[in-house]
Regions:
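Catalytic alpha-helical scaffold of carbohydrate-active enzymes acting on polysaccharides/glycoconjugates
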Residues: 1-147, 152-193
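Active-site donor-binding loop signature of nucleotide-sugar glycosyltransferases
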Residues: 196
């Protein structure tokens, strides 16, 4: 029998408030457990418009119909509409995922900014970003996070070294076929990477 791992990245407030409850019902019905990884900070989904000039962005938008998928309000968060702090409005559903036996971890503080601006951010910004996510996780679950997965499988030497400070059991920051321990600047890191 093969083992399958199911990773659920919750990127938006809408995903937290309607996606989590829907998925929990489906998973419960089929007796399936998953790993839920939450975005905790501002839902800046509207800022994804910065991607408009990237290759493939417009075709993806025409395929997925983001207004139908996310709703107009979500599409405006962080631009014309204030960005809500996701965990402040969705703690109940985040906790429910863990209560129902699913693994929980950190996906992001600010998903859109990390995804789009990682290569342009300083070590100070990244440290603050990770700390805010870990603080929010602790506020929701009353304990430290043991897992983190990065938005869009984006990482670099700085992010991998910063994660080492948190004593995670594992992270999922890249694509690949088997778990490994990254080597950064000649140092074998202690945080196991489980690619997807």
């Amino acid at each position: 029998m093969k083992t399958l791992s199911l990773r659920v990245d919750v990127d938006t407030l809408q995903g937290s408030l309607s996606g989590i409850p829907t998925l929990l019902k489906i998973l419960d019905k089929h007796h399936i457990k998953a790993g839920f990884y939450f975005s905790f900070g501002p839902d800046n989904s509207g800022r994804a418009i910065r991607r408009i000039f990237r290759k493939g962005f417009l075709s993806k938008m025409s395929r997925t119909n983001p207004v139908k998928l996310y709703g107009i309000k979500t599409m405006l968060y962080g631009t014309l509409w204030p960005a809500p702090i996701i965990f402040k409005e969705s703690k109940e559903w985040m906790r429910r995922a863990e209560e129902e036996g699913h693994e929980v971890g950190i996906h992001a503080w600010d998903h859109v900014d990390y995804h789009d601006l990682l290569d342009h951010k300083s070590e100070t910004w990244l440290n603050q970003w990770f700390q805010q996510a870990h603080d929010a996780f602790h506020e929701v679950f009353g304990r430290a996070a043991k897992a983190a997965v990065s938005p869009a499988w984006r990482c670099n030497d700085q992010t991998l070294l910063i994660q080492e400070k948190y004593g995670l059991d594992y992270a999922g920051d890249c694509r690949g076929t088997e778990p490994f321990y990254p080597i950064v600047q000649g140092q074998v890191l202690k945080t196991l990477q489980i690619p997807t």
